[in-house]
């Protein structure tokens, strides 16, 4: 046997002898004063009818149009949350949740009630759908919100704290005061504002504001409100549905493509970038998008790893969070916020748009 072959054999044997070890990921992090705190908010946005019918979206049929099954999302979330008490999730669309709820055994319902009570599962916004804010009459908006809130109160004895209108095309001051502050929300978050407005607000750190939507009611009906830096999706390369192509955090040194240092560096860089356009040391990452978490384990496995290794690195602090936790943290800073008094209309999402949006397609 030649020297090269012998050397190769020793290397191969060495690699085969490396043993993997179980890693207990530390996901118990909480807010750390003085650091940039990255609030990882796990969520799905489930359109109550879009490319498919409501029934098709719920059961997962007609997937030649779009691979989406809300039933899978909710079925998958419950065991994922039970696997780690530090994990959190928010859910919005009551039209789907109530269907799913009626399909569950009393045993599962009791488990979900415990998850809601503990704060692991937060039901936010609370309406049957995420209504448009331009075309509907305000009575219809009130009715569909009331219908959802009544169910949540009756079944869970909680009242949603957060407005979460992330996908309507533009936003109305009426939503801010009548279906925000007057409903009792502590804050209101949204994704779609005009691209020019978003760029300006990034520059002067005014994506988050105090929104005083009623001139007659004044400060008595104002609400803390925030637009996301880039719609309602995660930062680039942090999508982890089972068929997504973002690079995973590979932390097994006995396998190829070990990349903990590289992935942590990317995470910290993205956190710093958002902190530079945000007031206070708290930033929110919306970890999810349309019809995600159909296999929740793939998301939580990666978020567990990021929280563990990013916090070992120490430059920023990552934690499982919810919009309520994020809102409380923002309030606690006693920051002064810009004042907003009018609509976020009209809406265009890119420069080449020929027409501005003022409501749904």
Which role does the model predict for each range below?
Residues 3-20:
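Cleavable N-terminal signal peptides of Sec/SRP-targeted secreted and luminal proteins
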Residues 18-361:
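Catalytic-domain carbohydrate-binding cleft regions of carbohydrate-active enzymes
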């Amino acid at each position: 046997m030649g020297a090269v072959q012998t050397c190769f054999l020793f290397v191969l044997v060495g690699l085969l002898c490396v043993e993997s070890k179980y890693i207990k990921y530390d996901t118990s992090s909480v807010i750390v004063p003085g650091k940039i705190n990255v609030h990882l908010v796990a969520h799905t946005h489930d359109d109550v009818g879009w490319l498919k019918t409501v029934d098709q979206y719920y059961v997962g049929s007609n997937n030649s149009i779009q691979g989406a099954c809300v039933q899978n999302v909710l079925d998958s979330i419950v065991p994922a949350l039970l696997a780690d008490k530090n994990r959190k999730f928010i859910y919005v669309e009551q039209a789907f949740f109530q269907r799913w709820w009626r399909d569950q055994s009393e045993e599962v319902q009791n488990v979900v009630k415990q998850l809601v009570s503990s704060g692991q599962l937060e039901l936010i916004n609370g309406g049957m759908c995420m209504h448009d804010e331009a075309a509907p009459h305000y009575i219809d908006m009130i009715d569909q919100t009331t219908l959802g809130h009544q169910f949540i109160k009756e079944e869970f004895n909680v009242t949603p704290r957060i407005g979460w209108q992330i996908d309507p095309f533009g936003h109305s001051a009426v939503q801010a005061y009548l279906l925000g502050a007057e409903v009792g929300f502590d804050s209101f978050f949204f994704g779609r504002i005009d691209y020019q407005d978003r760029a300006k607000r990034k520059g002067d750190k005014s994506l988050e504001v105090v929104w005083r939507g009623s001139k007659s009611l004044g400060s008595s009906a104002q609400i803390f409100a925030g637009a996301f830096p880039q719609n309602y999706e995660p930062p680039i390369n942090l999508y982890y549905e089972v068929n997504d192509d973002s690079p995973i955090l590979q932390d097994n040194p006995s396998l190829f493509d070990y990349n903990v240092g590289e992935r942590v560096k990317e995470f910290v860089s993205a956190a710093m970038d958002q902190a530079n356009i945000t007031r206070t040391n708290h930033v929110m990452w919306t970890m999810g998008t349309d019809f995600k978490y159909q296999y929740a384990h793939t998301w939580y496995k990666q978020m567990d790893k990021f929280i563990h290794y990013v916090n070992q690195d120490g430059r920023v602090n990552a934690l499982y969070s919810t919009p309520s936790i994020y809102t409380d943290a923002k309030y606690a800073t006693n920051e002064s916020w810009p004042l907003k008094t009018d609509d976020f209309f009209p809406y265009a999402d890119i420069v080449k748009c020929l027409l501005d949006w003022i409501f749904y397609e």
